[in-house]
Amino acid sequence: IKSVNETINISSKAKVRTVISHHKCAGRENWGKSKTTLKLIEEAKKDNFLDLDCYPYTASSTMLLKSFVKRADKVLVTWSDNYPDISGEDLNDLSVKFGLSIDKTIDKLYPAGAIYFQMDDEDLNRILMFPGSMIGSDGIPGDRHPHPRLWGTFPRVLGKYSREMKLFPLEEAVYKMTGKSAEVFGLESRGTIDVGNYADLVIFNPDTIIDKASYKSPKLHSEGIESVFVNGKVVWENDGATNNRP
């Protein structure tokens, strides 16, 4: 809550468009606080250009840091320069394997990356549904064992959160991931389908689209995507990439 208030204050005084990224309530001590933060953001939007983005998972991913480990329920190591073969393993299991404390295990692995399980579904759903929220992947392509959001974010929103859970209609789900983002970041002629716009298109089946990537197998292809166009050129079809680089 303090950080959101600080951001709103800076945005108001600087009079610049501001994006709160990636809005979440991490750590059990913060669960439920999205009720307050979203009210603060909604009120601030009346007088400021204030937006927020989020991703559709209750686990985050960044460098392996002791401060982050302390507030997470579970930690998976995504990569380690010193131990490249341990990608995807549980930090607690590695601690037992090495016969070291968690802190010393982190020192042994560092530099390294990790996935932190530290958010609550109710907060996530509330933030996803917030009218002003954009949805992105925040994926990190270079990780040896990436967060599944890298491969599954957008089909997950369309399949799980829109079709199955009905948090918002299909057209709103699409807008949160395309038109809204293009508008906020000033990407002219992108994000919407219109005459004269760049033809960035995804052809998908709304009845079957769903993510398959998991924390155990994070690179599984999603289902229900028939083809993808970038600048009018087909870059994905028949469940595989083409050679086009538009």
Predicted feature locations:
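C-terminal cap of metal-dependent C-N hydrolases
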Residues: 126-132, 137-138, 153, 201-245
